[in-house]
């Protein structure tokens, strides 16, 4: 017995009593390689000698962390909203007008006030107008739009709505392999079933409807398939799906009675000649009422990617189409539990969907910065694929869009065996060794899912051009040494 009379005290919450679903969650983008990179950065600051002077994080799609400059107009308006006294200063008039409009829609005229749970009404109206412009006039109803703290928040919310059942009645959700680990992590946390369909690497990561049919048939043997998720442009694979592919997916969703989730956060990031972004909503409505009146769709967008790269503001939205009115009430209830999305994120989203117009003073600077950001990304996408494809043992598909490449590695058998001895996936072994020897931080392909017997890494194209050249050269040199060491 202890002095307080409580005897042996065992924690209420420990690894045996915690939610078992949380233990099943994995998120490779910030996994062991990244955690080791953080340790190495601390060691470098402490003066520990390394064969390099800095860690270059090419693991995550965080444009500003990689040195991309913010869009001037966006930051001016946000500054005015955060500190309205600046409205008396010498900011451009259109920036002041935009800030006043946003502040008038905020409680107490402040970004510090809660908003409506689905987001500030005038911003939802602006999002609807943006979608209409993007989709050639197809109507968008602000009541179908829910603002969110980044697209990830909205995606998880939608998965919560979809998840139900036990045993063979558990909800199954179709996700691509390779996939963005948000999806597998959320499904694990919600105790839903992941139904994997494979993209075709030999055809530039294209999507084959026959593979979808195979996957859903296999899924029905142990769960209840209810949804399919598509990332377009692709993460981690950098492909842009054709219009025909999108039509095929919509028909498949209708035939199999599946809810369709379209992750379109990279919609401005299209680089390859002959490629074009087509929104699922636009294609759905152009296919006619046979599909547009019945297929249930949620599409997602974000302030974090494209030319903006404003990850930290956590701005995003989802638009729902053909959702049961009673389910919409439940969705509204669910988002209200979190009170509201980030209000500064909502303000930034408003600027993304309602940027400066040609007759406004900030327009020329905005267009110049937007065009420059996208052009630089396009050049880096081409350069990355070109350089990696000169390395024997690395094969890289064209980076058609998004911010990543997902090259295939040919690894010596000796390296694969060495990885097994360390109880690591071979590409984890490769990426960890790359980090320790060069300071380059990548994400192993095994964290995204891949066909058995294949190995990859995901690398962002976001580092500044000169730094990206260094990254690519270091990878080239390392891969040669690695292959020689384990041959």
Each model region followed by its residue ranges:
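PLP-dependent class I/II
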Residues: 1-118, 122-487
């Amino acid at each position: 017995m202890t002095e307080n009379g409580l005897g042996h005290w065992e924690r209420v919450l420990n690894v045996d009593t915690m939610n078992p679903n949380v233990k099943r969650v994995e998120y490779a983008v910030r996994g062991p390689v990244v955690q080791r990179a953080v340790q190495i950065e601390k060691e470098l600051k402490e003066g520990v000698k390394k064969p390099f002077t800095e860690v270059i994080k090419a693991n995550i799609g965080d444009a500003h962390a990689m040195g991309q400059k913010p869009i001037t107009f966006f930051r001016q308006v946000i500054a005015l909203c955060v500190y309205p006294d600046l409205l008396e200063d010498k900011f451009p008039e259109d920036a002041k007008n935009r800030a006043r409009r946003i502040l008038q829609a905020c409680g107490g005229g402040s970004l510090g006030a809660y908003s409506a749970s689905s987001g500030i009404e005038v911003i939802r109206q602006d999002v609807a107008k943006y979608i209409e412009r993007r989709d050639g006039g197809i109507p968008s109803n602000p009541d179908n739009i829910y603002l969110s703290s980044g697209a990830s928040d909205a995606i998880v919310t939608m998965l919560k709505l979809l998840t139900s059942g036990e045993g063979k009645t558990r909800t199954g959700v179709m996700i691509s392999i390779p996939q963005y680990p948000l999806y597998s992590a959320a499904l694990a946390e919600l105790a839903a079933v992941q139904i994997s369909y494979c993209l075709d690497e030999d055809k530039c990561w294209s999507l084959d409807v026959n593979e979808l049919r195979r996957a859903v048939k296999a899924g029905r043997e142990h769960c209840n398939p209810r949804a399919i998720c598509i990332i377009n442009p692709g993460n981690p694979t950098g492909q842009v799906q054709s219009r025909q592919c999108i039509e095929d997916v919509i028909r498949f969703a209708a035939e199999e009675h599946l809810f369709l989730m379209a992750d379109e956060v990279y919609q401005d990031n299209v680089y390859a000649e002959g490629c074009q972004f087509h929104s699922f909503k636009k294609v759905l409505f152009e296919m006619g009422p046979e599909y547009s009146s019945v297929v249930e769709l949620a599409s997602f967008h974000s302030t974090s990617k494209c030319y903006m790269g404003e990850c930290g503001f956590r701005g995003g939205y989802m638009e729902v189409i053909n959702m049961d009115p009673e389910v919409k009430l439940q969705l509204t209830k669910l988002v209200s539990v979190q009170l509201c999305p980030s209000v500064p994120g909502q303000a930034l989203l408003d600027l993304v969907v309602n940027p400066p117009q040609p007759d406004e003073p900030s327009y020329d600077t905005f267009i110049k910065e937007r065009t420059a950001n996208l052009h630089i990304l396009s050049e880096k996408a081409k350069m990355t694929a070109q350089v990696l494809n000169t390395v024997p043992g690395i094969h890289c598909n064209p980076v058609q869009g998004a911010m990543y490449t997902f090259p295939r590695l040919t690894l010596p058998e000796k390296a694969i065996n060495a990885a097994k001895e360390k109880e690591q996936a071979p590409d984890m072994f490769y990426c960890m060794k790359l980090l320790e020897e060069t300071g380059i931080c990548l994400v192993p392909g095994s964290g995204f899912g891949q066909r058995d017997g294949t190995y990859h890494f995901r690398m962002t194209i976001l580092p500044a051009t000169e730094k990206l050249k260094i990254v690519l050269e270091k990878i080239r040199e390392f891969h040669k040494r690695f292959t020689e060491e384990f041959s």
